[in-house]
Curated annotation (Swiss-Prot):
Keywords: Ribonucleoprotein, Ribosomal protein, RNA-binding, rRNA-binding. The gene is rpsH. Part of the 30S ribosomal subunit. Contacts proteins S5 and S12. GO terms for molecular function: rRNA binding; structural constituent of ribosome. This is Small ribosomal subunit protein uS8. Belongs to the universal ribosomal protein uS8 family. It comes from Psychromonas ingrahamii (strain DSM 17664 / CCUG 51855 / 37).
Length: 130
């Protein structure tokens, strides 16, 4: 049986890994998953990510903790295969009044809501992280 929503699977693995206090989580890799992991690393939500393997590349995300507590409080999928959510540059949401981020897939790549607002481009809202 094939996976219906690989991005939701990635977010769930990260959420479950942090709940179980794992050091890292592994998952099948794709270009979009790597782009999301890069945004999470740039924003300080994960320590590192590595893509390994030739025939079946695997993405390993090293989770981040601060004083024994998980850094990612909530990570929630917004746009899903059954209901895509697109917003223009002026309608992009602010997560927790700017304390969290929304990860947006735009025509210029995957970026945060702040970067998309600054570049005046909208796109598909992938998830909220806080």
């Amino acid at each position: 049986m094939s996976m219906q929503d690989p991005i939701s699977d990635m977010l769930t693995r990260i959420r479950n890994g942090q709940a179980a206090s794992k050091v890292s989580v592994k998952m099948p890799s794709s270009k979009q998953k790597v782009a999301i992991a890069a945004v999470l690393k740039a924003e300080g939500y994960v320590t590192e990510f590595v893509v390994a393997g030739d025939t079946k590349p695997e993405l390993e995300v090293t989770l981040k903790y601060f004083e024994g507590k998980k850094v990612i409080d909530t990570i929630k999928r917004v746009s899903r295969p059954g209901l895509r959510i697109y917003k223009g540059a002026n309608d992009l949401p602010k997560v927790m009044a700017g304390l969290g981020i929304a990860i947006i897939s735009t025509s210029h790549g995957v970026m945060t809501d702040r970067a998309a607002r600054k570049a005046s481009i909208g796109g598909e809202i992938i998830c909220y992280v806080s």
